[in-house]
């Protein structure tokens, strides 16, 4: 329902504090030597500032705003602020539902209704928090503490996966929220869900949240390494859940591309051998991401190339056979390109004696 990210037509939650001034970019010096103009304290003042700022263009001279236009603009801005207040109230109502204790003497029907209400609250919050302003407000309302402390470990799988999804939704591309979530110890709990939960949906949503906390987030990646996250990721790739396998392989590939400094760690874990073993399983679209990860692991990394050349792996023969299989299938073009790149990188030269010299 809400626009994603900070873009769209939503107005900012609050004006900047007076100490920051109100200029933005290179055009903010038009006030001359009189200092920064006073910031408006209400909607009427904001409207007046917008009109004044618009009239500073020297050429052509601005036309006076008609009363009809002025009224329309004021109503539109009022509606925007009112909509934001309403969404904050919705989030507060959801948090009231989620904060309630489960009735200790409730019967089966009452417990089912209670769970449905909590699931509905989590779903509405996930919808609202697609907007970055709402996600920030949710965290200011201590919503993240409630999710991490209570709902990631809830007894009902429907609550666990919705909590993981909401954590990921709030954390996407917002460093301040990522840092708060990491500080609450969420990554350890999410990795445990990915590795051990009995519900496939919980595991998929946990992986989504993990991805939002470690991609482009150095502190998150360091925690991921300390918690042996790559081993958890490899085990997820070995499961029978196709969506989980694909998303795990894609995250591994992304981390290898973005953080090549960890290739040595992965090789020491036997990652090359495990990836090749996955390629040997019955063919599926998942193999494209496995081969992509393997390509990333050997690119500009002689240790990875040497391990791929180990005769007992039989990788060269496997890749040549796979190329023959894929050549007539346009839908597997990217996988074919990965196979050809691996052949070129690992098996185009006759020996590896000079690789590190």
From Swiss-Prot:
Inhibits HSPA1A chaperone activity by changing the conformation of the ATP-binding domain of HSPA1A and interfering with ATP binding. Interferes with ubiquitination mediated by STUB1 and inhibits chaperone-assisted degradation of target proteins. This is Hsp70-binding protein 1. One of its GO terms (molecular function) is adenyl-nucleotide exchange factor activity. ARM repeats lie at residues 130-172, 175-215, 218-257, 260-299. The modification Phosphoserine is found at residues 349, 354. It holds the Pfam family Fes1. Gene3D superfamilies: Leucine-rich Repeat Variant. Keywords: Phosphoprotein, Repeat. Transmembrane segments: none annotated. GO terms for biological process: positive regulation of proteasomal ubiquitin-dependent protein catabolic process; positive regulation of protein ubiquitination. Residues 1-69 are annotated as: Disordered. Residues 19-29 have a biased composition (Low complexity). InterPro entries: ARM-like (IPR011989), ARM-type_fold (IPR016024), Hsp70_NEF-Inhibitors (IPR050693), Nucleotide_exch_fac_Fes1 (IPR013918). Ubiquitous. One of its GO terms (cellular component) is extracellular space. Interacts with the ATP-binding domain of HSPA1A. Detected in a ternary complex containing STUB1, HSPA1A and HSPBP1. Interacts with PGLYRP1; this interaction blocks the cytotoxic activity of the PGLYRP1-HSPA1A complex.
């Amino acid at each position: 329902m809400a626009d994603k990210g900070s873009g769209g037509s939503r107005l900012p939650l609050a004006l900047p504090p007076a100490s920051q001034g109100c200029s933005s970019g290179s055009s903010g010096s038009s006030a001359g030597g009189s200092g920064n103009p006073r910031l408006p304290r209400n909607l009427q003042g904001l409207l007046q500032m917008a009109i004044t700022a618009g009239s500073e263009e020297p050429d052509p001279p601005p036309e006076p705003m008609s009363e009809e236009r002025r009224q329309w603009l004021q109503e539109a801005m009022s509606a925007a602020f009112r909509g934001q207040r309403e969404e904050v109230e919705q989030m507060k109502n959801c948090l009231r539902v989620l904060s309630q204790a489960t009735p200790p003497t409730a019967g089966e029907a009452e417990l089912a209704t209670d769970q449905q209400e909590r699931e509905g609250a989590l779903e509405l919050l996930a919808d609202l928090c697609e907007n970055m302003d709402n996600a920030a407000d949710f965290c200011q309302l201590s919503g993240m503490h409630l999710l991490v402390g209570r709902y990631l470990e809830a007894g009902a799988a429907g609550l666990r996966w919705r909590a993981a999804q909401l954590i990921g939704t709030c954390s996407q591309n917002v460093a301040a929220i990522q840092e708060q979530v990491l500080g609450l110890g969420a990554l350890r709990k999410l990795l445990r869900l990915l590795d051990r939960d009995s519900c496939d949906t919980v595991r998929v949503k946990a992986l989504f949240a993990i991805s939002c906390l470690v991609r482009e987030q150095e502190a998150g990646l360091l925690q991921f390494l300390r918690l042996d996250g790559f081993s958890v990721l490899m085990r997820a790739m070995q499961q029978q859940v196709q969506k989980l396998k694909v998303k795990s392989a894609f995250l591994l590939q992304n981390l290898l591309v973005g953080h090549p400094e960890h290739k040595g760690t992965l090789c020491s874990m036997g990652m090359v051998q495990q990836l090749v073993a996955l390629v040997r399983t019955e063919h599926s679209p998942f193999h494209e991401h496995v081969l992509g990860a393997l390509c990333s692991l050997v690119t500009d990394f002689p240790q990875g190339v040497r391990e791929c050349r180990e005769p007992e792996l039989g990788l060269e023969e496997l890749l040549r056979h796979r190329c023959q299989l894929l050549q007539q299938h346009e839908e597997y073009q990217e996988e074919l390109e990965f196979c050809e790149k691996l052949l070129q990188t690992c098996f185009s030269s006759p020996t590896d004696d000079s690789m590190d010299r």
